[in-house]
Regions:
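Alpha-helical scaffold segments
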Residues: 2-250
């Protein structure tokens, strides 16, 4: 049935005003309007592009400008479309197959977390991601030494996401924030000392601190401060308990 015939029937049954309302609707414009009218309709509902036969490049570009996620509705989007989509919504890269270097960079520069959507990212992309957000390293498989170092520089606490961190990384982390030692397994005496040097209270996060570390902490504490005195007494108590335990074993 032709459009003219449909129009005639609707007017006959429902009246002229009913047809006018249909013509005014954005759905009608999506199906029958000019390119300008269709674009205007798509601005209201980007997903309506699914109902347009052979949408133009201009239409495709317009919908990703409105909603980056709409890139998933477009087959083989151009790089310009990809960039517009990621500019509007950085995580839209999730829906882009084999994004270019420029698209990847733009996405991770907006949010390092988006590296989780990039397959086999280069070291360059990894570095940009952790610079934007150190925690992005948790989404990187087998990060290089350079990437690990950059991530810890930007956020020392991300060391907890790094498998078997080197002594160099541990030292870099605790030199920025002593409390990071809580996330380091079996820290060496050198790492413990650096943590306490940065923040004496971080000794509370160290399991079995060495005598040298305890002595360093006590020297740093203000003995006249009641809070500090409690810390010192606790160390003495723990030390005595450990000695008693060892004697009992003998």
């Amino acid at each position: 049935m032709r459009l003219s015939e449909i129009k005639e029937k609707i007017i006959k049954i429902y009246g002229k005003r009913s047809w006018e309302k249909i013509e005014e609707s954005y759905e009608y414009k999506v199906y029958t309007g000019t390119e300008k009218e269709q674009i205007s309709a798509l601005i209201r509902d980007v997903y309506a592009i699914q109902y347009i036969n052979n949408p133009t490049e201009k239409m495709k570009l317009e919908i990703v400008k409105q909603n980056g996620d709409a890139i998933k509705l477009i087959s083989n989007p151009s790089e310009e479309m990809q960039l517009e989509a990621v500019e509007q919504r950085a995580s839209a890269i999730e829906y882009i197959y084999n994004p270019s270097r420029e698209v990847q960079l733009l996405s991770v520069q907006k949010s390092g977390y988006n590296i989780q959507y990039i397959k086999d990212p280069t070291e360059e992309i990894q570095l940009e991601a952790v610079r934007q957000n150190g925690i992005a390293i948790k989404y990187i498989k087998n990060p290089t030494k350079k990437v690990k170092l950059e991530a810890v520089k930007h956020n020392p606490f991300v060391i907890k996401y790094i498998n078997n961190p080197s002594e160099k990384l541990k030292l870099l982390a605790v030199k920025q924030d002593g409390y990071v030692i809580e996330h380091i397994d079996n820290p060496s005496e050198k790492v413990q000392l650096e943590a306490v040097k940065k923040n004496v209270y971080s000794i509370a996060c160290i399991h079995n601190p060495t005598d040298k570390v305890i002595q360093k902490a006590i020297k740093e504490f203000d003995i006249d401060d009641t809070c500090n005195l409690k810390y010192i007494l606790r160390f003495i108590k723990n030390d005595l308990n450990e000695k008693d335990s060892k004697e009992d074993e003998v």
